[in-house]
Every structure is written in C-alpha cells, then in structure tokens.
Amino acid sequence: EDTIKPKIMLNIFEDGQALIYNDEYISLISNDSKEIWKTKKIVHHWGTIFDDKIYIPGRKYANYPEDLDENSKKIKIGKCKVDNALVDTILILDLLTGEVLKEIEILPIISSHSILSKKLGFSKKIFSRLKTNNDQFESKFLGPSYCDDLLHLNDIKIITSDNEKFFDNAKKGDYLLSLHTMNTLVLIDHKSLKIKWFLRDEFRRQHSPNITKKGMLLVFDNKGSDKKFGESRIVEFDLLKNNFNPDFDGNESFFFQSDIRGRIQIFNDQIYVTSSQQGEVFRLNCYDENLKNCKPQILFSSNTKEKSNSIFVADFYEKDFFKKDFLNKINKK
C-alpha cells in the first residue's frame, strides 16, 4: 500500500532494498517494504547500476517529422509521418535519491553517423507499444511501420576499467547499447556522445550484450537461427580478434526460441540465459572455449502441461547472495 504496484524488479541489493518499475514510475523500496523514492518516468527492459547511478532505457513520444532533429529530417526517416512515435533515451538517475541527472535522446546520435544514419528506416516490423492516455499507458497494436519505433533500445551496459581494453578507444563510463530495430550494437562516448564502434547485421532483434573477462561479447540473438530447433541462439564475438566464434544454438534435444526479450547474465564465468518467451532459465555448462559445445541445463521452467508460459525475468541471482544477514534484514519485525 505504501509503494507503487511493481511490474518489474530490476535489482535487489545486499541490504534488502529493491529497485522496481511499472508503466509510470521507477522506485527504490526499502527492506521493510517502504518507498524510499519514486520518479515518474517511463522505463523498460534492462540497464546498469554504475557508480551509484542507474542507466536504463527511457521512453518519450514524438510526432514525426516535425519533432525530428535537423540531421534526421535530412535523411530517409525525414519522410516519416506518424504521431506518438517511440523516442528512445538513455535515462540516468541518482540511485540514492531518484533524481533524473540526464536524459539523452539516441536518434540524433545515430542520425549524425555517416554509416548508421543510412541504415535507419530499413526495418519494418509488427510491435506493440505503450500509448499515453491521461498519464496511463496501455498496449496498442501497430501495423508494419518502421517510423513508430526507429531504434528500440533494449539494454544499456556501461564500459568498466575491466573491459575498456577490449576496444580500441573505449573509456570507462562509455555506453554500450543494443538497438533492436536496427539489429545493431553501438558504443557511444559518454562525454562527446560520438559513436566509437558498432556491430550489426550478424543477429536479428538481439538483446542483452555481455562482455566476458576474456573479451568475448555474448549476445542473445532472438531470431538469427533457423526454425528447426528454434530461431534463437547465443552469439559470441571476439572483441580482440574482431571475428565471430561458433555460437550456441538449439539442437535435437533442446529447442531454443524467444521472439521477444531474452537475457544473458554471467556469474563466476558461467553463462545463465533467460529465454523469456519460453518461460525458461538455463545455464550453459561449457567444458572448453567453444560455445557450440556447451550443454544447456534447465534451472527453472514456468511451463505447465507442455504449454509455454512467457515470463520476464528481470534479474537472476546465485543462492549465495541470499545469506543469513540478507534474510534477517528483509524478515525483520
């Protein structure tokens, strides 16, 4: 009663606090279920907590072409004529207070790039979006129109001192973004907002880029495989050698497909995968460095009576996280 009605839990902290959001607010909740702060912003998918800041995909709405920036008006998407188009942003909030520190629109950054600007508008798809109506948000079906959803940002990773070395010119704090509509990953300088690196076209409708300790970029590729054993796969790109390695794919004994969502998490060098639309969480048991040889082990399934039950797993934890001290904090009287 004292908090917003949660839709997604983004993160649980060791002191028992929880970061949650719904269609209107993002909020931090105490370990005794009291609201610490709430901020009225539309957020979605996943982001990163870094240096006491939250970096998460934000969303606004605009009418095209009148609300397009000048660079966007000069290229193909300048012909778009649509109201309430989705506008993707990098939303940065103070973790302690919920204050909005900055909100960066991504489209002007892409439109100013000599190569990626030419790729805008080639993707046509059917998707649902949230439409504003008296400050409430409801799902509305759209036809195949790229103008409604030009980028569809679905993840933000922050480059750290541990992985900046895997790129030629990355710096701690830079943004690694996953742009679903463009089938593109892009690295953006966090100060100049210039594009430093990008990777595209080797995956379709991807989510959840993750960098391993060895410089391997893992990507949940939603629709990059064939339909025989499922269209999804886990792609591995060697950032140092600049080439793709064999991927993990479905097979005769393991069907793998999530058309939407999907997430990869890494704990102690082990790969955990949420296949959201299948309602399954599995671990890849890998005995060598070839991802193709990894064996999936189902850890959780929401399926009942052989029927898929789609879930949205926002965060996955090892059981060691929930130590006695943590449980005492959330169970205190």
What are these regions (language model features)?
Residues E1-K333:
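Histidine-/acidic-rich catalytic cores in large beta-rich domains
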